[in-house]
Swiss-Prot record:
Highest taxon above the source species: Archaea
Entries under Pfam families matching the protein: DUF2100
Protein name as catalogued: Uncharacterized protein MJ1481
Amino acid sequence: MRVEYSKDLIRKGISTISQLKKAKIRVEKDDKKISYKDAKPGKIDVNEFKKAIYLLIEADDFLYKKAPKHELNEEEAKEFCKLIIKCQEHLNKILANFGFEFEEKEIDEGALYIVSNKKLFKKLKNKNPNLKVVCTEGMLDIEDMRAIGVPEKALEGLKKKVEIARKNVERFIEKYKPEKIFVVVEDDKDELLYLRAKNLYNAEKLDADEILD
């Protein structure tokens, strides 16, 4: 009798869990739906609207370049989707002025961000003053200086600067013990910085427009 009662409880428990899971799925799906009928009075953000349009125009080039099949290789797919995602972000900002709510990307304050120049450093700090950002003002290895075309005669004088930059990064790592280390990449020189930091500190790459948009 007790065994049958236990089995019955288990069956009811499984049934309840199943119903809760289904209900949760329905709620999550409903939460993601938006309708123009929910729009509130607001103001068009012209600047964000123009940014979205320019990105779509840039993405539109793929229709002509890849006609008639419109098949993209991996690099092309990344570039195309990057444009579309950035466009979507600008459109979300426009819709936010009309009462729609979107989950914003959170910037990881527990990470360390390595940048190559003071301009990028200031942009990140303006975005979020709490970010841990270290500026190298160049490369982390003299060989990378050579790779970007610095004359041989100038390399000797830059060795000390490179050494200081490296020690500065390591000082930040020791002080903050970051969960992750990112190199913010804006151009080809930053790519070199990223590759070196990946080798030295297991750093990850983060496109500048991903964190600054």
